[in-house]
UniProtKB/Swiss-Prot annotation:
Belongs to the lentiviruses Tat family. Signal peptide: none annotated. It comes from the Viruses. It is found in: Host nucleus, Host nucleolus. Interacts with host CCNT1. Associates with the P-TEFb complex composed at least of Tat, P-TEFb (CDK9 and CCNT1), TAR RNA, RNA Pol II. Interacts with CCNT2; the resulting complex is unable to bind to TAR RNA. The gene is tat. The keyword Transcription applies. This is Protein Tat. Keywords: Activator, Host nucleus, Host-virus interaction, RNA-binding, Transcription, Transcription regulation.
């Protein structure tokens, strides 16, 4: 997002003249612990004005990525709990009902009557 010709972002106004750089002050600011920065502007000056903004805006680093919840994902899984046990029992009953066992332990399949 580039700002238009108008001042539509909340940056402090830039001086037209060159400012004298104080390296000690820059190093002190650099080594300070990261603090919350509420600057919403994405211009070049605001992206590089502090270490936190540089990491967030310049490099795109996010330490707390919040997942978007998809509606309906908290539904019960149909294969869990008592339903799965009931299905397993029903399936095993249907398997054994279609077979007959002989005295020597062999199984034979029953044939369905066709009309």
């Amino acid at each position: 997002m580039e700002p238009s010709g108008k001042e539509d972002h909340n940056c402090p106004p830039q001086d037209s003249g060159q400012e004298e750089i104080d390296y000690k002050q820059l190093l002190e600011e650099y080594y300070q612990p990261l603090q919350a920065c509420e600057n919403k502007c994405w211009c070049k000056k605001c992206c590089f004005h502090c270490m936190l903004c540089f990491q967030k805006k310049g490099l795109g680093i996010r330490y707390h990525v919040y997942r978007k919840r998809v509606p309906g994902t908290n539904k019960k899984i149909p294969g869990s709990g008592e339903e799965a046990i009931r299905r397993a029992i029903d399936l095993s009953f249907h398997r054994t009902a279609s077979r007959t066992y002989t005295a020597n332990g062999q199984t034979t399949e029953k044939k369905k009557a066709t009309a």
